[in-house]
């Protein structure tokens, strides 16, 4: 409510534009990341920055890591998948990180981890 009257906190614009990288943590895209992206100017800053922008999926094996993300995706008509999350950030995202069992197995074998 009244998000159109909000503005980035002091220093945020400069921080995004001068960042070496931006990471969107594996959080709910609607109730955690969404309100931040709804602040006027934030999406534009993410598009304008020269920094690579990474997002980490909060969906693994069609389930949320925590919270209501999977349920919300379903209720809003999205598939419960990492790809659905990536599409929400598509206009500014450079790298999308998702869980892959095969990568974990290769990593574990490579580094002799259980």
Go through the PLM ranges and name each one.
Residues 1-83, 91-93, 98-101, 105:
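Conserved catalytic alpha/beta core of Sir2/sirtuin-type deacylases, generalized to analogous enzyme cores
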Residues 85, 114:
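Short phosphate-binding loop-to-helix
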Residues 103-113:
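N-terminal low-complexity segments that are often proline-rich with Ser/Thr-Pro
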């Amino acid at each position: 409510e009244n998000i159109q009257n909000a503005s980035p906190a002091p220093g945020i614009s400069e921080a995004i534009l001068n960042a070496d990288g931006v990471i969107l943590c594996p959080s709910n895209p609607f109730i955690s990341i969404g309100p931040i992206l709804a602040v006027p100017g934030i999406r534009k800053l993410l598009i304008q920055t020269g920094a690579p922008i990474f997002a980490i999926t909060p969906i693994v094996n069609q389930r949320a890591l925590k919270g209501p993300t999977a349920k919300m995706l379903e209720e809003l008509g999205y598939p419960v998948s990492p790809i659905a999350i990536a599409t929400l950030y598509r206009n500014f995202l450079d790298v999308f990180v998702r869980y892959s069992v095969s990568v974990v197995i290769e990593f574990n074998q490579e580094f002799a981890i259980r």
